[in-house]
Amino acid sequence: MASQPPQPPSGQPDTQYEEYQSEVITETTNRPTPAADVYEITPTNDVMDDRYEHEHDDYESGAMYETVRTWSPQSRPELVRIASVFSRIDSHPDVAPTTEDGGQLNRRDTLAGVKIGDPVLDPTKPEFDFYKWARMFTHVMEKEGIKRNRTGVMFRNLTVLGSGSAVQYQDTFLSPFAAPFRPGELCGKGRNPEKVILHDFNGAIREGELLMVLGRPGSGCSTFLKAICGELHGLQKKKESIIHYNGVSQHTFKKELRGEAVYSAEDEHHFPHLTVGQTLEFAAAARTPSKRVLGLSRKDFSTHLARVMMSVFGLSHTYNTKVGDDYVRGVSGGERKRVSIAEIALSGAPICCWDNSTRGLDSATALEFTKALKIGSQVGGITQCLAIYQASQAIYDIFDKVIVLYEGRQIFFGPTRIAKQYFEEMGWYCPPRQTTADFLTSVTNPKERIAKEGYENRVPRTAVEFERYWKQSQNNKLLLANMDRFEAEYPPEEGHLEKLRETHGQAQAKHTASKSPYRISVPMQVKLCTVRAYQRLWGDKSSTIATNISQIMMALIIGSLFFDTPQTTDGFFAKGSVIFFAILLNGLMSITEINGLCKATEPIVPNAQRPIVVKHVNFAFYHAYSEALAGIVADIPIKFLLALVFNIIIYFLGGLERSAAKFFIFFLFTFITILTMSAIFRTLAAATKTIPQALALAGVMILALVIYTGFTLQPSYMHPWFKWILYINPIAYAYEALLVNEVHGNRYRCATPIPPYGSGKNFACAVAGAVPGEMSVSGDAWVESSYDYSYAHIWRNLGILLGFLAFFYFVYLMVSELNLSSASSAEFLVFRRGHLPKNFQGSKDEEAAAGGVMHPNDPARLPPTNTNGAAGETAPGGSTVAVIPPQKDIFTWRNVTYDITIKGEPRRLLDNISGWVRPGTLTALMGVSGAGKTTLLDALAQRTTMGVITGDMLVNGRPLDSSFQRKTGYVQQQDLHLETTTVREALRFSADLRQPKSVSRKEKYEYVEDVIKMLSMEDFSEAVVGNPGEGLNVEQRKLLTIGVELAAKPQLLLFLDEPTSGLDSQSSWSIVTFLRKLADNGQAVLSTIHQPSGILFEQFDRLLFLAKGGRTVYFGDIGKNSETLLNYFETHGAEPCGPSENPAEYMLNIVGAGPSGKSNIDWPVVWKESEESRHVQQELDRIQSETSKRNEGHGQSAEKEPGEFAMPFTSQLYCVTTRVFQQYWRTPSYIWGKLLLGLASALFIGFSFFLQNSSMAGLQNSLFSIFMLTTIFSSLVQQIMPRFVTQRDLFEVRERPSRAYSWKVFLLANIIVEIPYQILLGIIAWASLFYPTFGAHLSSERQGILLLYCVQFFIFASTFAQMIIAGLPDAETAGGIATTMFGLMVTFNGVLQKPNALPGFWRFMWRVSPITYTVGGLAATSLHSREVKCAQNELAIFDPPSGATCAQYLQKLVEAGAPGKLYNPMSTSQCQYCPLSSGDQFLGGSEIHWSDRWRNFGIGWAYIVFNIFATVALYYLIRVRKSSGRPNRIISVITYHLSQFGTYCRAFITGRKEKCPRKREQIGKIY
């Protein structure tokens, strides 16, 4: 490092300063006026002055107009690219525009030259011309006095702070135990230290300017854009930092004008089931101004505006297509990106910040998008900032200014045209073919930048030195002077704020606060969001209908369960049960409102829609509470209809009193309960940050609500430490009201009078509330004696429920508005404790690690001059020759065609594609968006799971065998890795399973170390993969993806799908030049790439170029300087490629890529008829002929392949099980969440039912305590399934196609790993529940049996979860099915309805329910031989006949074998008879017997074994056979016979006797 701070080179004259100093003098006195015919628009002088009065800039001299002048105003494709210029117009044929004095304009506007109502102004017509539409709009806006805000932004001393450090340590299961030995971390010190993300930024962006933000990933580009827009959620801006918008402070601007500065995130968030038209029409409606052109209605204005934007961005054909997402089929990824762009354009914001919005777009589309931004800035005055990772020279030249960031420090800010010269004069060398954007970013990469000769010790090296150099430069001084003039023009809070307020107020609707950032009032927001909520429901009708049907089916099941309940005292428990079920199911059906991460269709899923709501709130579309209120309003009618159907079924089928008054009271309370519980669950979801948090809290809350309803634990048996829950439980008030409503005024015949032969006053009914000598029991007396309920409380309870409802709705709306932002933190690496590299530093000097500054003539740094030469050294480096095994096999494909069926219609994705890949060559696969590049790659790699592929794919002339996938590497576009593993462990896992058994483990691991060195991953080889932001960054993940495939030593070919996607230009260069090195050393490589720069493109040897429809445009050599490729296109009619033009972009342009691109030449037809195409076929024939001769020379003794997998089954099982154990161990949140759920639930149940007495109610409560333990089953299952899905996704997407290990190994490993934790959970639950509930007096044998049952139950839960999720696509779908099945199991286990009371149809359900045997075994073991001591209200109290004792009077009853016990046999009055004498008698009513305990235990293990076999069978039938493309035999047989049955039915109905073909051979094809 230089001893002195770097200075500007003294030997070089500061030509920049002299040049721009002179420009400042000339600009302020002789500012050029733009040509009036640039767009053939002639605005009035007032508009001209308003637009250009502040255009002078110390850096600019009219250059911003030069680019536009070169674009032909007559070229409609160029004009269609105008993106966000205007957002207010309609050409209503029946309305004439008016001038300011009230006069009407003529139907033919001479200024625009277009007749209002002309088809060119209708975006739905093919004649639509956006240019003419914009001209008409501009004129009408001027005449009607409609204004729009315009503003620039200035930032001074901008410093942004975040939390986090450069490194964190991975937590494990034992981390909580080690925390006391790390007091610093325990106290919060050192865990999240403050970190400066942006250091002291300065700059000014004038209105209408376009700023490019350049920097490597992690340099602070996103944070800078967020700071400009004021969206620093979780980050902190220093007090000294100043940001203002033409004099308006950011605080005031964001408070009153939030929607005027918007930030477009890199990811897209939309409601997937809304169509594109609905999405954009909503955005237009939310920002529709109050004053509109031509006096149009809001509906017409917003609809037309959305249509215009869809036409501009090439989305008109998707109007009725769903937006979709990763789970819902919709528009393509590129189209979804354009939907996001159009949404922001419709916001009409004068300041827009775009975060890598060109990601995933091909170069032609990216260029169109950038041109659209440019025109929006120049014509609409929009100030725009765009962070971009890979920018072509054409894109770079469109921008006015550029800011370069280096590790959070500003190292340049100024005009784009001087940036390159600035860094060259600093001493850096720019290679001739490198784009300016790549060069500017490369100077921030020590491994990429090149110093000029003689400047090696003078150039800055670190980010701090670059920043120091910048601050001492004349360009910075000029910038500061310009900022001073900017502030002088716009004094703080003066003038411009009132102007902005006036313009904003003009756009606001009535009843909207003047200082509100929103344009429409709250009622209008609620109405708009309510309509959208119903659109979302309609968009996912199937899901909505399925949910409602499942609820109705549950009502039918529960109602039939209690069908024909006797209207006697024996029916009291059944009535309590059916009402308990009714209120519980009504109340808890809203719990699904919490979960909906992948289903944002329901208008009540706060967590699912939160990112979308946050985005729309930032765009000032609506208040968050308006969306929340709209969800409530939209949901009430749906809930009402569902509740009506549900409660009619359960009320009348369940045997409740058929009284109109009582039914409507029943419905009123159940409906209010639904709304109240919905409000509670909404509040819970809105108050938490993630769905798992909300579900965890909901699980505990539901347990408390169920126990303290009053049914499972009667109020008189509640202990004081938890009884308070009863008073805050809405379900408890509803249950009391419904129960007293049902029995009020009714008397019930005594089913079992004691003694049955008594008369007069000499008998009693053994039911609470009974009166001696009466054969019936008052319902009111029963509920008062049993529950202390009163009919007088019914309307009081309704008032309490309404109070709960209002309170939670209010809290929900408030929390929805306040709990939107999420904390942000700096990115960091995660290491295992004890594995941090010794030389690792948080922000180390990469220059020193790189070994100094590179020289311009160093051959290791210069790009190769010919495609066959050695590639330059890049970040992934090292010795490659000794690592890559030699390859000799040639992979060829001929006439590959791929057809699929979509909605019953055939579609061809690939059309007769031919080609080959030789060892030692690097082949590029390119094409326009939607051409089928990834599809072709999947087809060649044998990774398609649907459709029909035809054609020949050969290796050395032989058909592909079962080992092909194992012998090839496939680097997917998505970097899928297990987040808990380290880089080295991931590579070793791949080497262990994918290299053959003949290679020793030592050799495999040595090869892994070679791969680590080859990819330069030494610094993070022990880092944990983690999640984005908390682990490896984008480039490191991509290197790991490549490394995993290299570690497998692919013998044939390496496929790569978009290896540079999401990377900056330097990282992309590193990856591609590394691939070049692999090819030079014998590897065959085929890679798709969509945005290659000129120097990247020349790294490839051969190109396969596809057009839409999967048709070949070109296949052949690229040639030196792309001469071979360019000659082909130029000789077939294409315009010549310019000497400085990027050949990759040139090709995309000539074939008509981009939303509005067109080509007059059908290039696929040209290729098909070309000589080059015939040469390809001849070469394929020659290759096949040569390889066939070679194969014949070797005879039939070809090397025998080891088979589908490289390693045997046992080795696979060991490796995979070890990794899954490792994943669980390193995911303490899951393990501790599981254990704490079991511990907390068991303790809560145990202390709620603490030491129940031996009364009949006490025994019932004890049985309910066991029953409640089984209710945590559902929560456990919901926890297990997402973990399984995580492993399965990785296996099915990457490891199974690579033939790393068998699907049977995957299933067994996941089953095995769950068992130890389930055993531990069973032990915890056993100790936490049974000791508090039953005490320690049980024998050791019984305690042991209880422990065995608890462990068995939790193992059953895990295997059941895996059985359900095995064949289903996601945890949400499986969770719904599991919950339904669990509901059936607990319903029919004999606790809530005794088996002998079940209708005959349902008795089989009691026998097949696994919970029946678990509850039976636990209850029999706990209550066997327990003596019953009836409570006072449970005794049958009566007087014996005069002169007889109680024993004498009941002697006949005792001799008949009555189960009860007489407490006072010698008394002559007030005989006290308890109907039961032992716990076995009580259990016998539920058919639970002590003698069945071991039988039940054995049946439990049978269910576990069944779950395991069913898991394997379901996975095989649904996912293995389906993915293999083979027909499912069972489904085929069923389908065949159903079709035959249907044929006979049709013949019978029509009276025709058709003969159905049932020949043996036809059935044989199926079987």
UniProtKB/Swiss-Prot annotation:
It is found in: Cell membrane. One of its GO terms (cellular component) is plasma membrane. The chain crosses the membrane at residues 543-563, 571-591, 636-656, 661-681, 691-711, 798-818, 1231-1251, 1257-1277, 1305-1325, 1345-1365, 1372-1392, 1498-1518. Glycans are attached at N149, N157, N356, N819, N895, N912, N1253. Residues 1-37, 1172-1202 are annotated as: Disordered. Residues 1-11 have a biased composition (Pro residues). Gene3D superfamilies: P-loop containing nucleotide triphosphate hydrolases. The keyword Membrane applies. Residues 22-32 have a biased composition (Polar residues). Induction: Expression is induced upon exposure to a wide range of unrelated cytotoxic compounds, including ethidium bromide, ketoconazole, cycloheximide, fluconazole, griseofulvin, imazalil, itraconazole or amphotericin B. It catalyses: voriconazole(in) + ATP + H2O = voriconazole(out) + ADP + phosphate + H(+); fluconazole(in) + ATP + H2O = fluconazole(out) + ADP + phosphate + H(+); (R)-miconazole(in) + ATP + H2O = (R)-miconazole(out) + ADP + phosphate + H(+); (S)-miconazole(in) + ATP + H2O = (S)-miconazole(out) + ADP + phosphate + H(+). GO terms for molecular function: ABC-type transporter activity; ATP binding; ATP hydrolysis activity. Keywords: ATP-binding, Cell membrane, Glycoprotein, Membrane, Nucleotide-binding, Repeat, Transmembrane, Transmembrane helix, Transport. ATP binds at G927, V928, S929, G930, A931, G932, K933, T934. Residues 167-432, 891-1134 form the ABC transporter domain. SUPFAM superfamilies: P-loop containing nucleoside triphosphate hydrolases (SSF52540). It is a multi-pass membrane protein. Pleiotropic ABC efflux transporter that may be involved in the modulation susceptibility to a wide range of unrelated cytotoxic compounds, including ethidium bromide, ketoconazole, cycloheximide, fluconazole, griseofulvin, imazalil and itraconazole. Belongs to the ABC transporter superfamily. ABCG family. PDR (TC 3.A.1.205) subfamily. PANTHER family: ATP-BINDING CASSETTE TRANSPORTER (PTHR19241). This is ABC multidrug transporter MDR1. It comes from Trichophyton interdigitale (strain MR816). The lineage of its organism: Eukaryota, Fungi, Dikarya, Ascomycota, Pezizomycotina.
